[in-house]
């Protein structure tokens, strides 16, 4: 069965973005960027893949993307209505309309939809791209966390998981460190 994997960048104090969806405060490095491009090229937006020579690269881990409205909306400013056209894209939103054949807008119960997607035959998993509200809604279905932890305190912003109090156990399975002080850590549900 496929897994729902929450692959996300986060500050030391648990924020995936600033209060206005800023992510430019994360320290970058060529070492980490090269690692991400090789290991998870499908997590790079389509318009950037073309600029850095990843256009046409095979998806390594994911073939399906779930994205909430708050994470999706910045793509409209680029402008694009299909930020990850190399993946099957599901936009979870009860209010946003997108007229793009590559994006399926889901207004229904996202938990039921995730359960159906998990039962599909595929050697690739499902990427929960964000945001924190959607992660909170889907917490019961998240099988694995891949957290890019950056050595910075944001102070406030968009929480990695938003929702009610729901302690959920995960066990660490791997960790990689980079020259910018960031780490990628893998956690599986206990």
Where do the model's predicted regions map?
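Enzymes that bind and transform nitrogen-containing heteroaromatic metabolites
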Residues: 1-190
């Amino acid at each position: 069965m496929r897994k729902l994997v929450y692959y996300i960048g986060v500050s030391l104090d648990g924020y995936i973005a600033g209060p206005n969806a800023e992510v430019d405060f994360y320290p970058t490095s060529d070492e980490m960027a090269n690692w991400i491009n090789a290991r998870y090229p499908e997590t790079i937006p389509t318009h950037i893949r073309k600029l850095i020579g990843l256009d046409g690269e095979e998806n390594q881990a994911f073939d399906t993307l779930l994205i909430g409205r708050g994470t999706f909306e910045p793509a409209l400013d680029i402008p694009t209505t299909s930020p990850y056209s190399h993946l099957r894209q599901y936009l979870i939103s009860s209010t946003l309309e997108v007229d793009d054949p590559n994006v399926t807008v889901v207004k229904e119960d996202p938990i039921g939809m995730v359960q159906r997607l998990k039962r599909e035959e595929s050697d690739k998993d499902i990427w929960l791209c964000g945001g924190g509200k959607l992660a909170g809604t889907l917490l019961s279905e998240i099988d694995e966390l891949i957290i890019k932890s950056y050595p910075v305190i944001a102070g406030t912003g968009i929480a990695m998981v938003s929702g009610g109090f729901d302690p959920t156990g995960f066990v660490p399975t791997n960790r990689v460190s980079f020259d910018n002080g960031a780490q990628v850590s893998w956690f599986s549900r206990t």
